[in-house]
Amino acid sequence: MTQTLPVGLSATSVVAASSANLGPGFDSLGIALSLYDEIVVETVESGLTVHVEGEGAGQVPLDQTHLVVRAINKGLQAAGFSAPGLVVRCRNDIPHSRGLGSSAAAVVGGLAAVNGLVTQAGSEPMDDARLIQLSSEFEGHPDNAAAAVLGGAVVSWTEQAGAFGGEPRYSAVPVRLHPDIRLFPAVPQQRSSTAETRVLLPEQVSHVDARFNLSRAALLVVALSERPDLLMAATEDVLHQPQRAAAMPASAEYLAILRRCGIAAVLSGAGPSVLGLSAQSGLPAEALEYGTAHGFTVTEMSVGAGVRWTAGAVVRN
């Protein structure tokens, strides 16, 4: 039986950006970045009000189709609750449609905020495994969602639904990140969507290409955790980055320049952002100057934390 939450409850969640694939780990590897969105949810007598500040303001819908609202409704349903009405406030720092996991952050943040609401009604919160499952059902793959839930670097996988149907099972485990590794996201003004770039990928790949990526993905786990000196070889990919290059030539060119400068650069998710991984303390001047001159915002970030939620409206400064 569904319970109705009382009026006057509030909850806050803070959720990180993420970069998926990391080169060879297509739909499997991901890492959280220290760039965060904040969601504050309140239960009210009736209706729905959505406020958006920062990224996406004036561009995203402010009704039931808003991704955060959809995630909240899914989380409430999974927990056996409904809300009489909601006020949802989103403070967004994660760029949209840039390959930095903004949609995964919206979903994970919405689900986590539900934890803050239902615990005030005497219910147990959803654990990380449940958050990964529900958020990945939105995404269709768990790499960004798992990184947003767990923080740090993750390896995720999908077990297909059985003969009787149902959702696939999504899971993830954390990867210990070597302390010397630095993250350098480069974000262009250009936008892109995962759906648009996935159609560029072939339905089938050769055994040679599959073997190449399998070896690099396995090596990348070692490079991330123990051997940063192997990052250049470990981030090579033949399954998706070359195929997407024509749709984002500026990103492909900057990726190549970073790699020529010794930075293990990859497309961030489906692009168009580029992520550099390095044990160096900064980017070479040539790489930084090229990025700035060609419209990329290049920064150094630390690894992001896992999603945090609390009962009550706790707004960050």
From Swiss-Prot:
Pathway assignment: Amino-acid biosynthesis; L-threonine biosynthesis; L-threonine from L-aspartate: step 4/5
GO function term, MF aspect, one: homoserine kinase activity
Annotated catalysed reactions: L-homoserine + ATP = O-phospho-L-homoserine + ADP + H(+)
Subcellular location(s) of the protein: Cytoplasm
UniProt-listed GO biological process terms: threonine biosynthetic process
Entry EC no(s): 2.7.1.39
KW Nucleus (keyword) present: no
Any Pfam family the entry gives: GHMP_kinases_N
Keywords associated with the record: Amino-acid biosynthesis, ATP-binding, Cytoplasm, Kinase, Nucleotide-binding, Threonine biosynthesis, Transferase
Binding residues annotated for ATP, in chain numbering: 95-105
InterPro entries: GHMP_kinase_C_dom, GHMP_kinase_C_sf, GHMP_kinase_N_dom, GHMP_knse_ATP-bd_CS, Homoserine_kinase, Ribosomal_Su5_D2-typ_SF, Ribsml_uS5_D2-typ_fold_subgr
Organism domain of life: Bacteria
GO cellular component, one term: cytoplasm
Family of this protein: Belongs to the GHMP kinase family. Homoserine kinase subfamily.
Function: Catalyzes the ATP-dependent phosphorylation of L-homoserine to L-homoserine phosphate.
Official protein name in the record: Homoserine kinase
Organism whose genome encodes this protein: Mycolicibacterium smegmatis (strain ATCC 700084 / mc(2)155) (Mycobacterium smegmatis)
Upper classification of the organism: Bacteria, Bacillati, Actinomycetota, Actinomycetes, Mycobacteriales
